[in-house]
From Swiss-Prot:
Residue span of region Disordered: 72-107, 139-282
Species lineage: Eukaryota, Metazoa, Chordata, Craniata, Vertebrata
Quaternary structure (record): Homotrimer (via collagen-like domains). Interacts with NRCAM and NFASC/neurofascin. Interaction with glial NRCAM enhances interaction with axonal NFASC. Interacts with MYOC.
Biased composition (Low complexity): 79-90
Molecular function terms, GO-annotated: protein binding involved in heterotypic cell-cell adhesion
Protein name: Gliomedin
Length: 551
């Protein structure tokens, strides 16, 4: 235990000795730093005193020089020099050339004193020369020095007086549109405009429930149907001979005359009406034309029996429009296209390849067209002038036009002839001539047809079909017969003989598509129906009862 205590006291003593040694070392370093600082302070103090002494000497020299120069500047310019004794002048080496002028001598003494007794600082000399005049001699002006560096821009000066008004400048560009001003007084109400056109047909809705059974209709007129002449039946048995009559008295002999013309048979089987009456008189049976009874009537041969499968020619983006070919001249391959149901421009294509390639020229019409019922006949375009009851004939070659007003025709308030094609007037050309299909403004319900004279551009006759336009989707004319489709343009449900003025039984399919049928027209040059179906340009072959037209 005692040995452990002694070891602990030894360790504490060594620590105390280390601490005292560190304190002694720090004290020695502090004393050395203090001595070094005192030595530096003494050196700096002596250097400062030397600088102050030198500065004082320079100031005294500057003040002495300034006072001397001031004395020289105050001395009179014209004062004579002090007299000199002969010895002095003999000792003066500068007097060998004679006494100089007083002002030259004064200047020489000044220069001598300056060179002998003082070294003048340049700054002091410059200040002296600038403050006193006549002390410093100036030589000739030296060449101008180089231009100095550009100085800083000065402060903005005050605005000057406004100058005179200059000449008027050019018109500047249009500025921005200003704010809307105060609304003016209300003007007089304008005339009431026409109602806008219907929008495009929407999608077909869901099929509704069946309606109630309607009442039985009136019995139809059988005489309106075209009846085909039947085949000749077998000859009946001869009747019993009658009793012989009494002989008559002989007549006087007649004179011989020329043979008269042969009279045609009255009952030859080719009658102008809708039906042919076959007489029961046996005396006329043998004289009738047996071959004629085996043929159909000309009117029946002109009827359409069916429509063939369509061929698509082109697909365009416009829903409404027409594409037309010349009906009369088969050598003219041009095709004309009008886009939309209203416009003033017509596209003319050289032929069908140009139509497919999109190569065309524009033709500007004299009036806006309306509808999709235009035709081209003998190098002239016939169309409806928009917003009026007027037809226009525009000749392509001469670019001249004629107009024809159709009295009592419906052409406004969106009361279209055919709502599916936005059309008021539908023109048509067939083997019988030029026609126009329209609705009357008197009743506004029935479909009317007018035949036009191409030469005089006038109306020849009007035909009232009495068929309501509300049941019609579209229509066309072929070989003098009007054909009307249903409201969906899928079947032909009505036909009317325009030359005979009678209704004809007709009911056949037209197409299977339910797209918008904007145009439907018959062309007699190729016996096809031309249609515009929701942008599809289609051709339908037509099948007649007879392939040739009997006049």
């Amino acid at each position: 235990m005692a040995r452990g205590a002694e070891g602990g006291r030894g360790d504490a003593g060594w620590g105390l000795r280390g601490a005292l040694a560190a304190v002694a070392l720090l004290s020695a370093l502090n004393a050395a730093g203090t001595v070094f600082a005192l030595c530096q302070w003494r050196g700096l103090s002596s250097a400062l005193r030397a600088l102050e002494a030198q500065r004082g000497r320079e100031q005294r020299e500057d003040s002495a020089l300034r006072s001397f120069l001031a004395e020289l500047s105050r001395a009179p310019r014209g004062a004579s020099a002090p007299p000199q004794d002969p010895a002095s002048s003999a000792r003066n080496k500068r007097s060998h050339s004679g006494e100089p002028a007083p002002h030259i001598r004064a200047e020489s003494h000044d220069m001598l004193m300056m060179m002998t007794y003082s070294m003048v600082p340049i700054r002091v000399m410059v200040d002296l020369c600038n403050s006193t005049k006549g002390i410093c001699l100036t030589g000739p002006s030296g060449p101008p020095g180089p231009p100095g560096a550009g100085g800083l821009p000065g402060h903005n000066g005050l605005d000057g007086q406004p100058g005179p008004q200059g000449p008027k400048g050019e018109k500047g560009a249009n500025g921005k549109r200003g704010k809307m001003g105060i609304p003016g007084a209300a003007g007089n109400p304008g005339e009431r405009g026409e109602k806008g056109d219907h929008g495009e047909l929407g999608l077909q809705g869901n099929e509704g429930p069946p309606g109630q059974k309607g009442e039985k209709g009136d019995k139809g007129d059988v005489s309106n149907d075209v009846l085909l002449a039947g085949a000749k039946g077998d000859q009946g048995p001869p009747g019993p001979p009658g009793p012989p009559g009494p002989p008559g008295p002989p007549g006087p002999p007649g004179s011989r005359r020329a043979k008269g013309p042969r009279q045609p048979s009255m009952f030859n089987g080719q009658c102008p009406g809708e039906t042919c009456a076959i007489p029961n008189d046996d005396t006329l049976v043998g004289k009738a034309d047996e071959k004629a009874s085996e043929h159909h009537s000309p009117q029946a041969e002109s009827m359409i029996t069916s429509i063939g499968n369509p061929v698509q020619v082109l697909k365009v983006t416009e829903t409404f429009g027409t594409w037309i070919r010349e009906s009369a001249n088969k050598s003219d391959d041009r095709i004309w296209v009008t886009e939309h149901f209203s416009g003033i421009m017509v596209k003319e294509f050289k032929d069908q390849p140009s139509l497919l390639n999109g190569s065309y020229t524009f033709i500007h019409l004299p009036y806006y067209f309306h509808g999709c019922g235009h035709v081209v006949y003998n190098n002239s375009l016939y169309y409806h002038k928009g917003g009026s009851n007027t037809l226009v004939r525009f000749e392509f070659g001469q670019e001249t036009s004629q107009t024809l007003k159709l009295e009592n025709a419906l052409y406004f308030d969106r009361k279209y002839l055919f709502a599916n094609s936005k059309t008021y007037f539908n023109l048509a050309v067939d083997e019988k001539g030029l026609w126009i299909i329209y609705a009357s403004s008197v009743d506004g319900s029935s479909i009317l047809v007018a035949q036009l004279d191409e030469r005089t551009f006038s109306v020849v006759q009007h035909v009232n079909t009495t068929y309501p336009k509300s049941k019609a989707g579209n229509a066309f004319i072929a070989r003098g017969i009007l054909y009307v489709t249903d409201t969906k343009d899928m079947r032909v449900t009505f036909a009317f003989d325009l030359l005979g003025g009678k209704q004809i039984n007709a009911n056949f399919d037209l197409r299977t598509s339910q797209s918008v049928l904007a145009m439907l027209a018959y062309n007699m040059r190729d016996q096809h129906l031309y249609s515009w179906e929701d942008g599809h340009l289609m051709l339908y072959p037509v099948q007649f009862l007879s392939t040739t037209l009997n006049q």
